Amino acid sequence: MTNEYYDLIMIPGLKRPVKAMQKAKNLHNEESVLRVEAEYDQAWQAGDVEGVVACLKKDAVVITPRGDVACGHQEIRNLFGEFLGGPAKGSTHTSRIIRVNFVTDDVAVLDGEALIEGGEFAAASSLAHHMFTDILVRSGGVWLIAQIRAYAKYQVQVRQNH
């Protein structure tokens, strides 16, 4: 058994100190999952369906804001091939990550919003600006997207009491 020593640091909002080593590990993991999201956006921009698929686990599930569901690389490849070759041809996809939560050391849940600009889809659809939740899983040291669940943005209307 080895003795390990850690610096303890206080993070605003937490009631107990956190090991500095754990914080550094979480920052590295966060950078890694954000890199996958950036690679996904870059592949979309390039119209590179194989690049999009490379960001996903082989058994990934994608649910689009239009309600399309694709399971596994082949269905996802077909879905993105039709979409990026059709109504979203020449479009850009920009993700803004709102929150990253590590459920375990190897599972991350990301909440964000995406904006699709350019192409017929963006011009004609209210779904061009939507929210999403991605689940990423690390296997063999590599982070990949296991689930994409995109959904329409909505606004809550507050009733006025008269």
Where in this protein do the model-derived segments appear?
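A beta-strand edge to alpha-helix "cap/lid" segment located at domain peripheries
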Residues: 2-54, 61-162
